Amino acid sequence: MPTGPGAEAFRAAIRRGLTIKGIIDPVARANWETGMMVVGDRESDFNNTAVNGEDRNAREGNHSAGTLQFTRTTFEAYHEPGTSADRSDNVAQVCAFVNYAMNHYGVSADGSDLAAKIQQADPTRPAKGY
């Protein structure tokens, strides 16, 4: 499990975001936390100010940003009302990630199939964008 200031700040944000989303079961919380920690590590090394200015999305004016590297359009589409509209806000990214994972990829509310449905969240498989 990753450690360090960025990882610990993101882990705390995951826990706050899961509470906002109403995910209170300890097993479900562990499923989501484990997967999102893998994604945060792979996408940005837990850097909430990371910006990708290099890929196709960036060339099209829709760069990805934040710990989980959401494009502006995806973040806005899956934004959780009541959370910050700033993509550098980790709690807002966590809530948007849960919404995106469940609605776009069909991940169950308990997160038990998160790693199976989003390869980037699976520590046993190679990194792959989502």
Q: Model-predicted segments: where are they?
A:
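Export/targeting segments at the very N-terminus of extracytoplasmic proteins
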Residues: M1-F46
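Second-shell loop/turn segments in exported
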Residues: M1-G4, G22-P26, G61, E80-S88
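Catalytic cores of secreted/periplasmic lytic hydrolases that degrade extracellular macromolecules
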Residues: A9, A13, G17, I24, ...
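A short alpha-helix capping/helix-coil boundary motif
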Residues: I14-R16, T49-N52, E76
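Short, functionally critical alpha-helical segments immediately adjacent to catalytic or ligand/cofactor-binding
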Residues: V27-E54, V94-A101, A115-I118
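Short amphipathic helix-turn modules centered on a small-residue break
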Residues: T49-E60, G66
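Catalytic and binding regions of secreted/periplasmic enzymes and modules that target cell-wall glycans
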Residues: A65-L68, R72-Y130
